[in-house]
């Protein structure tokens, strides 16, 4: 729509918006300014359009930042689907995970982390991923990784301290599957350095592991014991039990495959 179609001139000589009826011009006080008697001003429509434009660019900047941080956080794109929206929120541990996010500022201020432990396949990584994705939406920097990846990344580096400091710099660090990595003296040394530096940074840490909590607490091997002691110093243990979700998913896929394959004539799948 052309501007002349939305503007009219009032009896006072000022331009008015035909839509909202508010003046689009105003008189300078007294003698004017540099020979001009009036100046432009925003009407209600102009102000609304400006606010919408500002919101658009602010939202665009926000989601671009979230997208960048998300790509840094996860090594696999499928983890971006690990969200509370896709979770069973009637689950007690999942509810606690959501509460952790809802109280993030207090958790961060008090350096409170979590240790999700329990049998294989019960959804510990998924829970940690839900926390990560929800915080990422609020522009919190998160890194979710595991020690096998960390050790492989660090091994060829001349300056290992820089890498470890980078892990410590994220507002939240999530270490997935503690205990599946190599148990060499070198590996345990790297693990301790990462955990120790993280704790000294004062920033929260979340760990997932298949190791039983009593095994973690009663570890006698010195190199492992000092790692576990540091973790328990910061992370609140939460048991994640129940049936294996991986087995349930595999069973569901098997039944789906049988249904699809048996639609064709011939020998049925067993």
Model-derived regions: residue spans:
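Active-site catalytic microenvironments for nucleophilic, acid-base chemistry
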Residues: 23, 134-138, 197
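Short glycine-rich substrate-engagement loop in P-loop NTPases that contacts/grips substrate
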Residues: 94-101, 117, 132-172, 182-189
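Structural motif
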Residues: 172-174, 206
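A short, basic N-terminal segment
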Residues: 1-94, 249-270
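Walker B catalytic acidic pair
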Residues: 177-178
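Walker A/P-loop nucleotide-binding motif
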Residues: 108-128
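A short, well-structured juxtamembrane/interface segment
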Residues: 90-112
